[in-house]
Structure formats: C-alpha cells, structure tokens
Amino acid sequence: LNSLTDNALMLRVKAGDVDRMGLLFERYHRKLFGFLYHMLGQAEASEDLVQTVFYRMLKYRHTFTGDGEFRTWMYHLARNVLADHVKKNRHSVRHSDVADYAEKIGGGVGADEQLQREQEVATLHSALAKLSAENREVLVLSRFQELKYEEIARVMNTTEGAVKVRVHRAMNELKTIYLRIEN
C-alpha cells in the first residue's frame, strides 16, 4: 500500500476505502502544516487547519477525479480552508513564537546552532510576513512545499508564466526585506 501513488490512494478513498486516508495524512501532514504555518504564522491554528483540510478531503472526496495531481487538489482545498479561516479571524491574526515552529521542525543540534537556526527562522518568518498574501503564498508553494510551477498555476488558477514572474518578483522582494531586517 505504501507504493500506491497519491492519486491511487485518493481514488480508493473516494470509492469508500476511507482507511487509506491515514497514508495520505502520513505523507502530507507536515507539508500542509508548513504551508499553513508560513501563511498564518500560528502553529496551533495551522495544526487545526491541517485537520480541517483532511476533513474536507473526506467530505469532498467525490470531487476528486484523478485526472490531475492529488497535491494540486489538496492545496486547492487548503487555500480554501485558509481563506475561510482568515475571513473568520480577520482581527485576531498574529504570528506565534518562533520556538513553536522550531520545535515542529526539530532536529538534534547543539544549543548555539539551535539559537542561530531560530534567529534565521525568525528573520525569514518576519520577512515572509511582510510580503503580500499572494507573494507569500506563491513562495511557500514553490520554495517550501516544492510544487512545480505547473502545479502552482493549477492551484492558483493562473498560467505557468504568471507563476514564474510572481515567484521571481516575490523572491526579490523577500531578499530585500530579509536584508533590511537582518541589518
């Protein structure tokens, strides 16, 4: 079962074998958390939204056709869940402690390395937070979630060329902001 593609697993879930959702959860929980965390900056809310995305995958499994990539469909659902959350909590969005995120990504490193990593993550997160939601989303999908431009175009309902331009501009803007914060 571990060798089944994501599409094959989701098609089984669609056919009623909902136990297969556990494998998809194992494969994508951390990636979805990373996407949502980079967009929101709130570890606890991001974890809750991951659960909501998987709930919606089950609820709307009948809409999965298997024609496109499972990841594209999943991130489309995640964008909708995120948009709903932001609308509902417009006035309470805040960025959580870097320590929460550093704990999530973990790793056994020394105290000095850990502190430096946390500082770099904090600076990067601050820079990402200053980007527009569109620029932040395209960077998170391309750089952190490692989606191909073609997949991002389908998720965002735009062209591959437009995605390339947005990523390039967003990277330049992020670099400028990061260097400004660092100095």
Where are these regions (language model features)?
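Internal acidic/polar
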Residues: N2-S3, S92-R117
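Sigma70-family region 2
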Residues: K14-A15, G41, T52-E69, K88-R90
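Short, charged helix-capping/linker segments at alpha-helix termini
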Residues: K14-L23, F33-T52, V155, E182-N183
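DNA-recognition helix of helix-turn-helix
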Residues: A83, K87, N135, F144, ...
